């Protein structure tokens, strides 16, 4: 009989980005929580690129922050370069991104977990989940001991039956140099969960001292830089002050020689040599994948990103590969600035087990077993931010399950986390899932600037934001509404096309005026608080478009039964992405509703289809 060591409300398996947010959320809600890890020193490890955020991803980090999560605070404290992406486009598609000091990020997260009340770190491998009457009751570890629990969150990342590929070399592991987890796959087979194989990869790490930086383009950070957490100083803002010290990244490009080396050795890669059967991420392809799929492209952009302030390692973003190591050296040295580069760690691909997310409710609890939750790469997603967003929801709902309370659901119209979870649990995945703003039909509303306004109420209700924090948000919200009403009530005369017309000050925001313009040209006061000022301007600009978006979404729902002609030529439809065309040709949906439920078919694709069919203007 196994020895029962302890009893927990929630057990989290894994200490990556999903596991951290799940464990912290559950513990902060008052659940006695255990985090089981293979190595307590790698909690929060960045397996691939040393960065947080990106298109849509940065918005997710701010949503996690609004729910009381940790990722935003961690990157604000350990980031070494900060940028706002898509600044040439509207606010609705802008997102923050930051380079991280990888070692400091990991140390920060480990310290937070170690000091969190109700959270206990266990360096043991969970090899089995104990179930009675379709309800989780405990876990069993590789040491043969058992822990009782009411809920389990599985966040194994790439570690479940992970296999690393470098050329024709196959190495069992969850990350290069680290063991994989094996026992849990047997548990899932025993309970008839389908298991599929997905694949991802990472580039080599380069010795900074062997790079010729004079041959590279400099890519600096923004000034002022954006921050991720509303609670990082200065509190109540999404911006750092000007003058924050940052490091540079650099840009280089592949060459025809690079492409020749890759083509000559394609048969030696794990992917094209037939060793890897798992499906890789469409939007983060290996360099060999790019060369095959875009044969006419003369060069591919590469970002060289420092891995930290106290290391010589450089991450070459855009050069992941599973080529043999000797070919990797030749390939990297064919790139300007890298002619004499030395590789510290080789690039590799990794294949791992995934349970299809259609096995889950939108709460991230499995349909087969009560109290069993999944989050992160194990659900078929790719990316730290996607993992963390699922992790905080799974952790919250695991704690609520342990307390016998109703779960939470995040809706598509209130968060990108809600968009992601809805996509995963209703459409499933045929390849690793990555978030983009185009996946949301509500992107004019669920922006990076208003995450705290959208989700702070829920964060407070769950006990993950303090009363003081929520009070500040409500005060700012009242200020925003007060200024909006004021500007809507004030009218000014403006010359347009030779005519002078009267407009409300609010309407001017939709005509590319700023509040500073209003102050300078018409003498109106503007809000002193920087966040209030920014938010008033953005909300007034977007309000009419958000209403139009809402009406369009209502119309789209009514058009779901529209028939699609069997002989339709998807190549002739303007506005469809390559992925959308491929998926529509493959699945041949007979109605627009069926098309909308295919993995990878975005609301934008459905709109383009309906316009082509003459159902929308």
Curated annotation (Swiss-Prot):
Task: Give the residues the record marks as binding NAD(+).
Answer: 280-294
- Entry's NCBIfam families? mnmG_gidA
Question: Which cofactor(s) are needed, names only?
Answer: FAD
**Name of the molecule in the record:** tRNA uridine 5-carboxymethylaminomethyl modification enzyme MnmG
Per the record's keyword annotation, is tRNA processing included, yes or no? yes
Query: Which keywords does this chain's UniProt record carry?
Result: Cytoplasm, FAD, Flavoprotein, NAD, tRNA processing
Instruction: Tell me what organism the protein belongs to.
Output: Aquifex aeolicus (strain VF5)
Please indicate which superkingdom the organism of origin belongs to.
Answer: Bacteria
GO-annotated cellular components: cytosol
Name of encoding gene: mnmG
User: HAMAP family from the xrefs?
Assistant: MnmG_GidA
